[in-house]
Amino acid sequence: GDRRDLNRVDRRQRQMCIRDRYDKVKIVLISGPSSSGKTTFSKRLSIQLMVLGLKPVQISIDNYFVDREHTPRDEKGEYDFESLQAIDIDLFNENLNDLLIGREVRLPRFDFNSGRRSYYNGTFKMKPDQVLIIEGIHGLNPDLTPHIDPARKFGIFVSALTQISIDAQNPISSTDNRLFRRMVRDYRFRGY
């Protein structure tokens, strides 16, 4: 009971913080380690904000990856999707700034199988009653949104701390749990 109550109180406080600052905050940035539950949290937060009368729009920073041939590599020569340089920061900021001033934007979609970015059909224009829910590992990195007024942003850090145990003596660490989640996600949704 106590842990569930604490989660409910925490969730309600987040809702109130965003609602009370809604006139200024138009971007909620969600960050956390790889496979920590950012996308799931974004979906749940969106539903909570809808209950409060807000209209959230979810955007994944992963859709702003540079094309595969421009993706940086780590010391082993493997693609480093967790590097900030793997993101087209200029396009990301251009899109955010355009949305905040009421311009129409063509939002990108990254195809992990082809390693290329494409675009959704049509354009998107942010309405006054909408808030952007943006999730990605660099969501709280100040270098991701250097030209966005901090008063317009609200940041949330998410981490999967739930422990799973094989038995009473053999717990699976949070890091290993995230690795398992990442392997399943990459296989099911990213083609590798």
Task: Locate predicted features.
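Single conserved hydrophobic/aromatic residue that forms the stacking wall/gate
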Residues: 2-14, 18
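Conserved lysine of the Walker
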Residues: 38
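Conserved nucleotide-sensing/catalytic segment adjacent to the nucleotide-binding pocket
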Residues: 71-113
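Hydrophobic anchor at the beta1->P-loop junction of P-loop NTPases
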Residues: 28-30
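Phosphate-binding P-loop
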Residues: 19-25
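Hydrophobic positions on the alpha1 helix immediately C-terminal to the Walker A/P-loop
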Residues: 41, 45
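Short beta-strand-centered segment that lines the nucleotide-binding/catalytic pocket of NTP-utilizing
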Residues: 52-69
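Conserved NTP phosphate-binding and transfer environment spanning the P-loop NTPase/kinase superfamily
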Residues: 21, 142, 146-192
